[in-house]
């Protein structure tokens, strides 16, 4: 049984339909990448899975149970955490306080302690008491990833975590992914950068205009396959 899957998932913003029958599957210990141009529906898919965009059709299944009608806090307690696009840190809080914000009032057990986050991103320990907004964009993204991990999720959703960052910073962030995977977390990465997605993913889904246009292992997909699917010229 897959750890998480969507079945014929649709999503709307008012009368506008953003997703059309999307089927994806994430197995335990796996990293999958969702690629596509702006407006393809990638972020809407992540918002549907995380519970931010509530889905009354119960088309999102986590460990075999529907989560579509749950609030995002309940989804997080069930074991899904999201690193949202744009980082969205609390500007009045320190780096350490931002990392711990999701643990207040909860007993969280697992690999990802504050010390483990500092081991993953040592710069965050150096700047633990600094205001989060005093950090560079890449460092703020590390805080956002650490904040999601510290809840010890079974599934980590990463939405456009490389957006607006320099290539060297993106490389540093993705260098942490083998350790994240080794901790037992399964990961869904949303990326516009096709090359980066192919490096990190066990399987790739390409989206265009709210639909999945291609899926498969990176080793099984040709550059032409991916480019055609990215621009919506084929459906598989």
Regions found by a protein language model. Name each.
Residues 2-236:
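Glycine-rich phosphate-binding loops of nucleotide-dependent enzymes
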């Amino acid at each position: 049984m897959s750890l998480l899957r969507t079945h014929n998932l649709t999503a709307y913003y008012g009368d506008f339909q953003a997703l059309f029958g999307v089927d994806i599957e994430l197995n335990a210990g796996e990293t999958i990448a969702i690629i596509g141009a702006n407006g393809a529906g990638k972020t809407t898919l992540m918002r549907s899975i995380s519970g931010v965009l509530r889905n009354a059709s119960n088309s999102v299944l986590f460990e075999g149970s529907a989560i579509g009608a749950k609030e995002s806090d309940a989804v997080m307690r069930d074991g899904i955490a999201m690193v949202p696009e744009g980082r969205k840190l609390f500007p009045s809080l320190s780096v350490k306080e931002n990392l711990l914000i999701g643990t207040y009032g909860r007993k969280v057990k697992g690999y990802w302690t504050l010390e483990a986050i500092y081991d993953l991103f040592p710069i965050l320990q150096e700047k633990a008491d600094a205001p989060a907004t005093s950090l560079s964009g890449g460092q703020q993204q590390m805080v956002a990833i650490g904040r999601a991990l510290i809840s010890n999720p079974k599934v980590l959703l990463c939405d456009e975590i490389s957006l607006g960052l320099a290539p060297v910073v993106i490389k540093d962030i993705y260098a942490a992914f083998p350790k994240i995977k080794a901790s037992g977390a399964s990961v869904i990465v949303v990326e516009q950068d096709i090359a980066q997605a192919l490096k990190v993913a066990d399987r790739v889904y390409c989206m265009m205009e709210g639909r999945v246009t291609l899926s498969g292992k990176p080793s099984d997909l040709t550059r032409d396959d991916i480019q055609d699917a990215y621009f919506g010229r084929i459906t598989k």
